[in-house]
Amino acid sequence: MAAPTPSNRIEERSGHASCVRADADLPPVAILGRSPITLRHKIFFVAVAVIGALAWTVVAFFRNEPVNAVWIVVAAGCTYIIGFRFYARLIEMKVVRPRDDHATPAEILDDGTDYVPTDRRVVFGHHFAAIAGAGPLVGPVLATQMGYLPSSIWIVVGAVLAGCVQDYLVLWISVRRRGRSLGQMVRDELGATAGVAALVGIPVIITIVIAVLALVVVRALAKSPWGVFSIAMTIPIAIFMGCYLRFLRPGRVSEVSLIGIGLLLLAVVSGDWVAHTSWGAAWFSLSPVTLCWLLISYGFAASVLPVWLLLAPRDYLSTFMKVGTIALLAIGVCAAHPIIEAPAVSKFAGSGNGPVFAGSLFPFLFITIACGALSGFDALICSGTTPKMLEKEGQMRVIGYGGMMTESFVAVIALLTAAILDQHLYFTLNAPSLHTHDSAATAAKYVNGLGLTGSPVTPDHISQAAASVGEQTIVSRTGGAPTLAFGMAEMLHRVVGGVGLKAFWYHFAIMFEALFILTTVDAGTRAARFMISDALGNFGGVLRKLQNPSWRPGAWACSLVVVAAWGSILLLGVTDPLGGINTLFPLFGIANQLLAGIALTVITVVVIKKGRLKWAWIPGIPLLWDLAVTLTASWQKIFSADPSVGYWTQHAHYAAAQHAGETAFGSATNADEINDVVRNTFVQGTLSIVFVVVVVLVVVAGVIVALKTIRGRGIPLAEDDPAPSTLFAPAGLIPTAAERKLQRRLGAPASASVAAPD
């Protein structure tokens, strides 16, 4: 029988649902639901909108009385419901227009290693775990310095209108191009000049991003036997789950999920016991350098092993811990009704001289929150691993848009863990050592001088707060992660266990942070491998083979290049705490948002090329906002005369001290530290310029191509010809009644995918 073509599409309508066939001789490959919105649904969505509007009113305008954290959770939840049901649906209908009779890259190129059609629940778990890393946890905690109101608005509204849109549409254009990487799509759609800039610049950006994420993991796990044991156990558990689904019980996702959750909980609980044994403390109390090498080895393995064996099941497994803990925190907010201690808008929002980070609300609030609302890193996953696992185009909305929406909710909860803390303790945790000298007495004096509302803090209060979580000190525990753990412990002990379990929850939170962030390191490494392969393949000759992921020598070689790049920077940061990656951390937010600018540029151009100029505002408005934020931030970082903001000004000040033979200057306490600052500010400033040049080249090329397209003279659309699908799978995480009925008819396990017979 001749292979069917997409033009053979047949729809058989039955009631409010239609069965879609790629060919009359094949079983259905999709169910299209066309049920009109009922009165009950209308009442529900109107009620959600009204409740959400009321919650936002309380959050935004109540100034003379304390605001309960529950209002922010309600406002966020209602906004997400309306956004997903209506705005995401608008994008699906007007821009994406999914065709489930078209085969996805996973179905067309199924090789059992990189391209593997995977159950949408596992894909959602992998995708969410891969995109949600340090950004949505740490960024909102640091941004609390500016107040809870601007942060909460940007996290929620920014995600619905920008972050979720970017993720959904990058996934869409990558799926339509056989899962190509972001850099390769820039070259294909915008031309060679922009393509070269992107294929060179994006790998540099992603290297820094992965190294920063890995450093947070190392810091969390160093000398933490509980965390090391529990996270190490997720690897054999994931391999077991992968083999179980692949060989023992194919399609039984719910079954293996229950087994995996049970084993994961056992690993978490037993980790506390192991940490208190002599052998456990000896085996799993690892130095930062040892953890670096183990993390590098794991990243390489996750990049080259079949995606079904380690990466996908481990990310899916981690999602249960991530979502479960965030849900527990949300329940804690609703049960404990904590009062927000942070001001709606702090004085640091305007002055720009806050102790946590320097800079005014615009643009640095948006840079600091980073992945919580809009994440360029997500675009790498949406054009990396996820499109190579997707079963059907109809699943893109729940995975792309819904995945980022879930990440945004994580950021909301992270914001609340910091906002409910006594603000004197918040700034005690986050004030630099330069101001506190790591002393409770000095910290109390410094924090009390910030002009915060509420009762002044005492050294005894600070010491008691540290003792309550089993720590020697909480003074100047900068970086955001310790504050998040302290806030999580503060919230969870009110709901489960009381004061006696506060220390347990604190150390659980440290382990949770490492588990949460590690999934972005492994998926990011694999996505970067695809990008390196695409970039080198453009040189032609024998390197052309690198663009074929099935060529294993190329996959191994590119993976080695990627882990060597971020691993070397990670080792530098660990062995030289004052230099290397620590000084690159301020670049993380800007680099991430500049990457989003590249992704949104490509999306906007593709929408125009497809003849949907009328809807180009959907990605176009977020693009303009992102460029305004990131280019302003980059300008200030490069040219500001304030040494706390401008890299080159700080470089000049420390270089002058170096030339004068100073042995101490600013935050540097000796000559070696002065040399470190001089070197690292030079690297920071140089990379800032490089990143801006790359983005400007891509945006200018995008504008030129878009204008030529409108005039009928643009570069042709680089979309691959569709291939007919022979695979059926439900579109949503929960199958509809019609989908379940068809599944039973086809004899598949509940909710699983089914391949049509040849």
UniProtKB/Swiss-Prot annotation:
Q: Does the keyword Membrane apply?
A: yes
Which Pfam families is this protein grouped with? Answer: CstA
Q: Report the main location listed first in the record.
A: membrane
Keywords assigned by UniProt? Cell membrane, Membrane, Peptide transport, Protein transport, Transmembrane, Transmembrane helix, Transport
One Gene Ontology CC term in the entry = plasma membrane
Membrane disposition: Multi-pass membrane protein
Alphabetical list of InterPro entries matching this protein? CstA, CstA_N
Subcellular location(s): the record lists: Cell membrane
Report the transmembrane regions from the record. 42-62, 67-87, 122-142, 153-173, 198-218, 225-245, 256-276, 291-311, 320-340, 361-381, 401-421, 498-518, 561-581, 588-608, 615-635, 687-707
Q: Which GO terms describe its biological process?
A: cellular response to starvation; peptide transport; protein transport
Q: Which family does it belong to?
A: Belongs to the peptide transporter carbon starvation (CstA) (TC 2.A.114) family.
UniProt function note: Involved in peptide utilization.
Q: What name does UniProt use for this protein? A: Peptide transporter CstA
Species this chain originates from: Mycobacterium tuberculosis (strain CDC 1551 / Oshkosh)
Lineage start: Bacteria, Bacillati, Actinomycetota, Actinomycetes, Mycobacteriales
